Amino acid sequence: MVKNELLECLLREKEARHSNGVIYYYTQTKMAYNSNRFEGNRLSEDQVREIFLKNTILSSNNIPVDINDIIKTINHFNAFNYMLEIAEEPLTEKVIKKFHFLLNRGTICEYTKDRIEAYINNQNMESILSEYAINILLEKYNTLIKKSLHDLIEFYMQFEMIHPFKEGNGKVGRLILFKECLNSGIMPFIIMKDFRLYYKREINDYEKKKRYLNEICLLSQDQYRTICKYFQII
């Protein structure tokens, strides 16, 4: 089972803090790089690896490095670790808020309320409606006994449409997808930055062309499955 073998391997390697050539290192660096790229992070993949392995960074061709990009990369590593630890627990509003907090801790976004006022503490009508919508979505989702990849993608798309946070909804949603894949015995996946324009376009047109997003996720799933086989995880 994907749930048993892959999750156990990721947790084992996380505790051992393995680095090169193993699935935990691959997943951490690939997901942090690609998911942050969707949100405008400008660090290169080599720089992300350098941060993960050595907690250092070298500028590329004397190009200034945005400290916010570094913090967001480290935050993604920490949020991914938390996701692994609670992968088999039910998906709740508390978990979603914790993902968002970990991803944005110490960044400009955390302190600039006019740029990111999450529904966590905001009590205006928009935030109240968002919180209500999230709770309804979670209630409906958690009644499903056996979840399919289609169910997970459907949840993600509705989460994106509710857009509970002013910023970072995509990164939170992609962590949710990975967590729920592990929890449901489904092969997880990392959506690479190469799909960015195609992926973003289909996000905005999901009701008409949702089959295309499913194809992106299935292709990404096949790519991750190939990596797992290469590392002899499955």
Regions found by a protein language model. Name each.
Residues 1-167, 171-234:
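FIC/Doc superfamily catalytic core
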